[in-house]
């Protein structure tokens, strides 16, 4: 069947904001697909609500709509654009669910829009638990005994019949949302009640738990002519029972016999054929380690997180091929873009091993529930490639950026045996490190396999690493052993530790004895055919396949795994920087370790090195490539943290230099710079111990804002009210030291705003000023930002522009910088300066049409703003109002408090744009899934300091028809001021307390603030987590609630009696 000529215009749905379970892999898939469809000559219309994506750039599609991914908005765009077809399989669960809604609402039929790729029947059969069960029965594929339930009672009677443990899986949800393993009736009641609420079709599957089986995944493709192939097989290190997104994964499978592999492979191909999927599909299976029996766990009839991993692991571009299949091309028509000679029908073969490790947010959320289960918790992932399992596993550990350079966590050697075993049995995010510690203590791999059901093969690899450590201790400075340790992935740092020397000495020793890495190509065909991909990984072998080109090159360091505080925004900037390097006539080389992103798509750069972003690995590439220099500005804190070591090693850093980076990051130098430039900042001091901290706080006066120096995303940042709180902060939150002092600032309660500026050293371009809706005290990444500013006087804006120019020139900034200001009584103070690209770059680039990262890169490569046609100063404002709103993943993270403060908690962002502030706010709230009806009940439970302000909001809510409920203290205050409210209990287990009313669906929103004292308020935390569980809008900052109120008021007609 040939390419379809009866369709001209295709709409692609993106996946919206990044949340746990749906991250940057969909930006990668969507970008690939849009470009592939344009390549085939189709007109592409893209809809996505997330501005921090490459796919929402104007060059990627013919028309780009950054609008909420809701039925109402997408229907309007469909009516306006009238596309011939819709491709929903690249937008994750969001895209699939929207396609189902559009179909059920009759919109697709009304407009004659055809669904491409996966038929609706297949989405239904794969996602609807009942239909899936029927299909598997017809195919004779075994699935665990299960029952579809729509009530809690139904679940309990089925569990009693088959016995516990059972697994609960809500239908049509993402990343295991609302699911879990239940070992008793009480747990089952809780999980099913919640799961039924979260499932859009109020349906849960209760199934026999097969926890402990091997979890195997196959990434399969099929075309309309029924050609099908397996792109990649993957094996989870962790057995069934832990969500695959939270598991360590190896590709290809490592422990299956040929018979087992063929058995599961055939089952996967039978399933994709039966579902008639045209495109990519992911099949998850459970294999009994002691027999040939297996079960089908689930099928994702779309591009997924696993397909991004499979694409990067094999070099086979799944999303690109899936998009072309959707328009009628066949696998045996298309050339494999990697080899250029073989066809896409040719199954990839790997002559290396790939390890994926999940990146968890528990460095940010120390109170979070770290136990792993069927609900996903990781925010991102890293991938490493090597010739041996030990090698790729250790490289992946280094890539995580959690302060480890080996499979070893500091401090575990002091943990008791009892605690060690408990940690190993109940898997947490750091189980790998506990397993390694147990092996160092002499536990046998058989004992550990008995406790964990992890295959002996994998545990034996961990044991081999431990044996090598012991050998190294016994034989210091043995060159043969050094070579062997490097072949198995040991870092110079780890070898230095075992030989009691420093990493630099090991590096010198290696170079003296020519123990150097070579770079191998990822070519999809195990070197069987000649391949053209510039995609490399390091290993300690003989033949080097990466040849330095004749052209002068520039290396850009990526930002590593996605985590809270360092998201896809930095990858966006990296990709744009590469475009500018190429446009300036240089060869662009990317180094990065994240398989989900666009930057690690090998077609983006001239060369891609898939490596950990550590000094050792970066230096190895620099020594081979001999670049003009390295750009660090776009890789977030990851890259900036390498500046000092690289500068000392004589590597040319392009853009802002180390001493100027230090002047922005080092407290004393920064204060001096501000003083010299005549720019005010909140009074502040530094402290290296508790006594100094108390002395500093007394001098400045409470409340103070405390934080460690050199961090991203406000990690361990707090507003402290009194001396007791400060003492506890110094004891628990930070390890202060002379090298890493704690910063203590006066906390100014004012309006916050921020600026991204681009400087060539002489002139400074300020694309725009963003005003935050939440006042100072809420992290800038968690605040709603408005552009252009709505409430800043001309005088304040002029002052911001003046200070920005002075800072950029005074700090010798070349390229990007981000400055945050706080404004109190028309006085402007600088809070912080980051001499690098920030997370607002994509948003501002979109709303001003300035490709900021490209402009900054051109300046770094010696052009001027004038050369590029930009004026000095503030760029003319847009006529529309644009809002950047944060999106959170609290529903996935039990025990994490959703109260907003100076520590960043959001995982993603959306954008809302319109002619007025109210309309833009409405879109931003809709896009971030904060939907409030036009009437209902709102609960106020407010701290004393905020009551007067909350009263004004309560009066306005009452005026538009909301019923106001309040907890005791708040209700009494309202009554004194003449406002009637209905009294509601906080938590007390009665039928009229907040959690009970939330469960009954009788509350539409909650406003809950905590006083400046931020006392450990257990009640408040229970109320907040109940609201999150029930999906009820929760506001912990009055400013956000006031913004929502403006929207509701703007949608309400006034009704007055005459």
From Swiss-Prot:
Every ATP-grasp domain range: 133-327, 671-861
Entry's EC annotation: 6.3.4.16, 6.3.5.5
Function comment: Large subunit of the glutamine-dependent carbamoyl phosphate synthetase (CPSase). CPSase catalyzes the formation of carbamoyl phosphate from the ammonia moiety of glutamine, carbonate, and phosphate donated by ATP, constituting the first step of 2 biosynthetic pathways, one leading to arginine and/or urea and the other to pyrimidine nucleotides.
Residue numbers binding Mn(2+) 2: 298, 300
Positions with a binding annotation for Mg(2+) 3: 820, 832
HAMAP family, A to Z: CPSase_L_chain_A (MF_01210_A), CPSase_L_chain_B (MF_01210_B)
Protein name from the UniProt record: Carbamoyl phosphate synthase large chain
């Amino acid at each position: 069947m040939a390419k379809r000529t009866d369709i001209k215009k295709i709409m692609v749905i993106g996946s919206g904001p990044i949340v746990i379970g749906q991250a940057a892999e969909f930006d990668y898939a969507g970008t690939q697909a849009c470009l592939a469809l344009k390549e085939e000559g189709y007109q592409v219309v893209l809809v996505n609500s997330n501005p921090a994506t490459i796919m929402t750039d104007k060059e990627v599609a013919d028309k780009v709509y950054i609008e909420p991914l809701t039925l109402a908005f997408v229907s309007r765009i469909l009516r306006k654009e009238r596309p011939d077809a819709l491709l929903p399989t690249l937008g994750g669960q969001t895209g699939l669910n929207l396609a189902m809604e559009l179909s059920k609402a009759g919109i697709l039929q009304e407009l004659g829009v055809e669904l491409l790729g996966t038929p609706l029947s297949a989405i239904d059969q794969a996602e609807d638990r009942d239909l899936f069960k029927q299909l598997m029965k017809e195919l004779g594929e075994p699935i665990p005994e299960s029952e579809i339930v729509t009530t809690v009672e139904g679940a309990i009677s089925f569990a009693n019949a088959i016995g516990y443990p059972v697994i609960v899986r809500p239908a049509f949800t993402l990343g295991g949302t609302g699911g879990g393993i239940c070992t008793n009736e009480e747990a089952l009641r809780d999980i099913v009640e919640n799961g039924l609420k979260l499932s859009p079709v109020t349906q849960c599957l209760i199934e026999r738990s097969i926890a402990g089986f091997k979890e195997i995944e196959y990434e399969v493709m099929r075309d309309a002519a029924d050609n099908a192939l397996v792109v990649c097989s993957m094996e989870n290190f962790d057995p069934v029972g832990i969500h695959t997104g939270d598991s360590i994964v190896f590709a290809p499978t490592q422990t299956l016999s040929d018979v087992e592999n063929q058995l599961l492979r055939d089952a996967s191909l039978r399933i994709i054929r039966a579902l008639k999927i045209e495109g990519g599909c992911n099949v998850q299976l459970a294999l009994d380690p002691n027999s040939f029996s297996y079960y089908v766990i689930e099928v994702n009839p779309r591009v997924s997180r696993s397909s991004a991993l499979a694409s990067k692991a094999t070099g086979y571009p799944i999303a690109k091929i899936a998009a072309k299949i959707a328009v009628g091309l066949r696998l045996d028509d298309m050339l494999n873009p990697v080899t250029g000679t073989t066809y896409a029908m040719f199954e990839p073969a790997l002559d290396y091993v790939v390890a994926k490790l999940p990146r968890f947010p528990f460095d940010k959320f120390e109170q979070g529930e770290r136990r792993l289960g069927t609900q996903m918790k990781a925010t991102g992932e890293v991938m490493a490639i090597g010739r041996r399992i030990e090698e790729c596993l250790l490289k992946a550990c280094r890539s995580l950026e959690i302060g480890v350079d080996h499979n070893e966590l500091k401090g575990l050697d002091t943990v008791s045996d009892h605690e060690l075993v408990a940690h190993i049995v109940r898997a947490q995010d750091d189980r790998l490190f506990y397993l390694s510690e147990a092996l160092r203590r002499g536990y046998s791999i058989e004992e550990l396999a008995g406790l964990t059901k992890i295959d002996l093969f994998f545990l034996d690899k961990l044991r081999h690493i431990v044996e090598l450590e012991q050998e190294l201790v016994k034989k210091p400075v043995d060159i043969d052993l050094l070579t062997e340790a490097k072949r198995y992935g040991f870092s110079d740092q780890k070898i230095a530790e075992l030989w009691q020397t420093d990493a630099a000495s090991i590096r010198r020793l290696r170079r003296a004895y020519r123990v150097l890495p070579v770079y191998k190509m990822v070519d999809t065909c195990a070197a069987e055919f000649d391949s053209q991909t510039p995609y490399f990984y390091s290993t300690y072998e003989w033949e080097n396949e990466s040849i330095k080109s004749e052209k002068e090159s520039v290396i850009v360091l990526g930002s590593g795994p996605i985590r809270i505080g360092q998201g896809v925004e930095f990858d966006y900037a990296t990709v744009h920087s590469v475009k500018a390097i190429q446009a300036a006539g240089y060869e662009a080389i990317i180094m990065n370790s994240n398989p989900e992103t666009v930057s690690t798509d090998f077609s983006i750069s001239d060369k891609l090195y898939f490596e950990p972003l550590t000094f050792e690995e970066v230096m190895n590439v620099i020594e081979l490539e001999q670049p003009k220099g390295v750009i660090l500005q776009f890789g977030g804190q990851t890259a900036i943290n390498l500046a000092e070591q690289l500068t000392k090693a004589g590597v040319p850093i392009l853009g802002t230099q180390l001493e100027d980076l230090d002047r922005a990051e080092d407290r004393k130098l920064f204060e001096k710079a501000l003083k010299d430039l005549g720019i005010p900042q909140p009074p502040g001091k530094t402290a290296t111990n508790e006594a100094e901290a108390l002395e500093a706080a007394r001098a400045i006066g409470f409340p103070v804002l405390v934080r460690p120096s050199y961090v991203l995303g406000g990690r361990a940042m707090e507003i402290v009210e009194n001396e007791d709180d400060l003492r506890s902060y110094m004891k628990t939150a930070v390890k202060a030291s002379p090298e890493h002092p704690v910063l203590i600032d006066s906390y100014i309660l004012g309006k916050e705003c921020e600026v991204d500026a681009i400087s060539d050293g002489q002139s400074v371009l300020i694309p725009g000023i963003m005003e935050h809706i939440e006042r100072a005290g809420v992290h800038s990444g968690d605040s709603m930002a408005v552009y252009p500013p709505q409430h800043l006087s001309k005088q304040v804006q002029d002052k911001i522009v003046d200070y920005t120019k002075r800072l950029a020139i005074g700090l010798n900034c070349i390229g990007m910088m981000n400055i945050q200001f706080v404004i109190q009584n028309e006085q402007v103070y600088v809070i912080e300066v980051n001499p690098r690209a920030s997370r607002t770059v994509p948003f501002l680039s979109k709303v001003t049409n300035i490709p900021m990262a490209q402009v900054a890169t051109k300046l770094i490569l010696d052009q001027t703003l004038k050369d590029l046609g930009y004026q000095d100063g503030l760029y003319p404002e847009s006529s529309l109002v644009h809002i950047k709103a944060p999106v959170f993943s609290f529903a996935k993270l039990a025990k994490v408090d959703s109260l907003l403060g100076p520590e960043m908690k959001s995982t993603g962002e959306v954008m809302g744009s319109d002619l007025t502030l109210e309309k833009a706010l409405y879109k931003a709230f809709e896009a971030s899934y904060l939907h409030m009806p036009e009437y209902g009940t709102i609960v106020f439970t407010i701290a004393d300091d905020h009551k007067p302000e909350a009263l004004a909001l309560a009066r306005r809510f009452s005026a538009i028809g909301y019923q106001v409920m309040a907890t005791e203290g708040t209700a009494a205050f309202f009554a004194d001021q003449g406002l009637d409210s209905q009294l509601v209990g906080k938590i007390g287990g009665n039928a009229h307390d907040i959690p009970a009313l939330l469960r009954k669906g009788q509350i539409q929103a909650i406003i809950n603030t905590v006083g400046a004292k931020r006392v450990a308020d257990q009640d408040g935390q229970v109320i907040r987590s109940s609201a999150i569980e029930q999906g009820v809008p929760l506001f912990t900052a009055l400013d956000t609630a006031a913004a929502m109120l403006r929207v509701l008021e703007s949608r309400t007609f006034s009704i007055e009696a005459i």
